[in-house]
Amino acid sequence: MGFILFIITLRLYFLSVISYEDYSFQATQNIMRTEILTPARGQILDRNNKPLAANDLGYSISLNPYLGKKANIPILEAELEDIVRMFPYLNLEELKNEYMKNYSSYNHSYITIVPFISYEDMNRAYTALTQSDNIRISNASKRYYPNNSLASHVIGYIGAATKEDIENNITSKYTGLIGKTGLENYYNDFLQGELGYIKTKVNVLNRPVELLDEMKANKRYDMVLGIDIDLQKELDKEFESKAGSAIVMDVNSGEILAAGSYPEYNLNDFIGGISEAKWNELVNNLDNPFINKIINGIYPPGSVIKMGVGLSFLEFADINEYTVIDTPPYYEFGGRKFRDWTPKGHTNADLIKALRQSVDVYFYKLSHKIGIENMASTLKTMGFGEVTGVDLPNESKGILPTPSWKLGNRGEPWFIGDTIISSIGQGLFLSTPIQIARYTALLATSTLPTPHFVKKLGDKTSSFPPKDVLNDFQKSKLQAIRLGMYQACNSVDGTAYSAVLGSPVKLACKTGTAQVVGIPQDIKDRVREKDMEYLHRSHSWITAFLPFKNPKYAVTIIVEHGGSASKATGPILVSIVKKLHALGYIN
């Protein structure tokens, strides 16, 4: 028994005294270091694989994590002086501050002080810098936008990750970047890829002595859009000196071939942080370049809403498309005169003529008859008052006005006059260009698509099946609606006839002029749009589908303060259709 106790005592002595020194030495000599690997961000490509958002390849510079100790500060400063000498555009104090900001006695990973140096700049300094054990040169990438402002509101940009971003997205802690707007934001999780790591055992000099584990950073491939750069450039050309929005969308699938919000801004200005001067220039621009008007521009829809309202009349007003209604120059109710857009009026009209010539009084009368609830029910089915589901962040749902909406949001009762002016897309009614484009596709196909920009995520093709939202009666009456739109473009007395004469294919369309300032209905002789101050002029709409007999695309355009709708938007529509034809999308 005594011998056994002696053996146990001897073993404890060995472990606690002799082995302690050996293990202690190893502990001070070997530390596990985990280096996080960040992937290159996925590219955003157009439908023909032309880059919309790409990556410049280069290098980053990192320093030994132990140079922040007081005794090592002279070494840190010497290394920084060498770096600045080779790259004179870098600032020594800024580099030192960046290092010390990230320095911690608990950190054993190299500290990045320069996130990106181009290949060209690094080539002449690479050999000299890599002679130092304190400096690490690693592969790096930097986002850039090869087309500058093209489709800026769609593509979006990346920027420095905030504390809140990092709390919600651990990858952004290591990349330092996150998608801020547009598709860069909406698909950020896909585009940023997945972090990797290298776990190594290092000695006190921070030199690796053993590889413990490794996982490569994973770039999740690139994202391909439905956008065609060449078609997008056509939109840009037409809106060079205009404000507003334009959308070209496949009516069957909802795939967007081109979409612009104007004015645009140069996405590359945001790489590394936008200058104060440039920021102020954009913020103070009265045409609001920071608003993505495709999804957040909310405008009175004006007469482009009349197709949906007309469908509601056919369902609830006990009429058909050929029922003729007297349409004098105005409709009088409650002591107010609700005037037609033309002082002479239109004598009489059925639904098809009311669409062809945009007969306001036809809509005034029948909206009074069926009431706002019936109209709103039809229009809600067609997607108004709700988001379309387009793959962009923070979409507005607009306003589909009803008595309950007005009471709840404005604390005011509903009046018959509200119903009457809502029937021509005025008053409280507000919609977005993407809602109008989607609604136009519904009129063309009888189904409601989900607008979308993405075509492929990596090797996975995206699918957004359209929704079957109309009842059988509504579907049966769409042909009459389409005929009214066809005649608006192709009959000599149609509101858009002269404006779209140059189109290479037959269109179905509807124009709309949406007032931005109130004009009393009692005023018979109104100021001409061209004589108004710019900001008082009406917004100009046109929406179309084409070709008429076999619809493939919807084109929706709004020109802010454009005045006469057909004159402001018709030529733009024709130019877009010609480009679609030239690119082979239509015969």
Language model feature labels by segment:
Residues 110, 205-245, 252:
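Conserved, well-ordered alpha-helix/loop/beta-strand core segments that scaffold catalytic motifs
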Residues 1-191, 195-204, 215-216, 243-245, ...:
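Membrane-proximal periplasmic segments of bacterial cell-envelope enzymes
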Residues 53, 103, 203-204, 210-212, ...:
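Beta-lactam-recognizing serine transpeptidase/beta-lactamase-like catalytic domain environment
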Residues 31-33, 62-72, 83-84, 107-116, ...:
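Second-shell loop/turn segments in exported
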Residues 581-587:
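Gram-negative outer-membrane assembly/targeting C-terminal domains
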Residues 41-44, 244-247, 257, 322, ...:
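Generic short beta-strand
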